[in-house]
Amino acid sequence: MTFKPLDPVTKYANDVVKGKILAGNDIILASQRHLDDLERQDTNAFNFHFDVELLHKFLAFAALVPDPDDGVPKPLMPWQIFILGSIIAWRNNKTGGKRFRRAIISIARAQGKTYLASIIAAYDFFVQSYQKSNQDILLSANTTDQTKKLFNYTKATVELMLNST
């Protein structure tokens, strides 16, 4: 079934599955899963839904997140929107919580993994943890040096956002 691309995540998934966007097998499978799950989301047997309204709110927030290297927000590419939207917009029907609580993002060096992680961390810190106390955000990487880089990058992102208000 082909869905009318109401949102950029579904449009990207459609384009990947149709072969309009060249992608590896894992992205093709993730795109097909997204489309299959959209079909199942209104059935009793499937406990999740794709929240398009939340996706648009998240993308509006992401458009404000500055890159600490120059202090300017970077426009997200369609593949980045697909990854972030898949993580953020799939929700549990009963709890409203995230369907995916962990994500492994494997991208070549210098392609923006740290920026994507900082967007998610900033969103969790500013939006999803709003009016909650004692919230923890876990940042991890393969090495201590990578974890420090991610922490410092995310810290700089949050500081830029706090100082811009």
What are these regions, as identified by a protein language model?
Residues T2-T165:
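Phosphate/NTP-binding elements of NTP-utilizing enzymes
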